[in-house]
Amino acid sequence: MNADMIAAWAVENGFQAIDSGNYRRHDNAGVITIEIKRMSFLLIDERQGLRPRLISRLFKDIPLTSGSGRLQGLLLDRNPKH
């Protein structure tokens, strides 16, 4: 993965560009922010009433073949099944 792939994934999944390398999405559960760095990205999950969850990954640790699936996996538990 690389910064361009993360940015494309963010836009495809409803994130709005805040500025260069930063994307944000609002939904009923709260706010998710993605900050793209030079060699990594930081996902900040701010759910209403809970402490923010920070997830940082190096691009080299996310294989190209399953990159978008792994990114989606980081968001899966946002809306737990009841």
Language-model regions: role of each:
Residues M1, I34, L75-L76:
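Intrinsic low-complexity, intrinsically disordered segments enriched in polar/basic residues
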Residues V11, K37-M39, G67:
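Intrinsic disorder/low-complexity segments
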Residues H26-I62:
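Acidic, low-complexity, intrinsically disordered interaction modules
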Residues A3, G14, A29, R38, ...:
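N-terminal cationic leader/targeting segments used for protein routing and processing
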Residues A8, R47-H82:
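Mixed-charge, Lys/Arg-enriched low-complexity segments
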Residues E12, Q16, E35, E46-Q48, ...:
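Glutamate identity and glutamate-enriched acidic tracts
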Residues M1-R24:
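Negatively charged, low-complexity tracts enriched in Asp/Glu with abundant Ser/Thr
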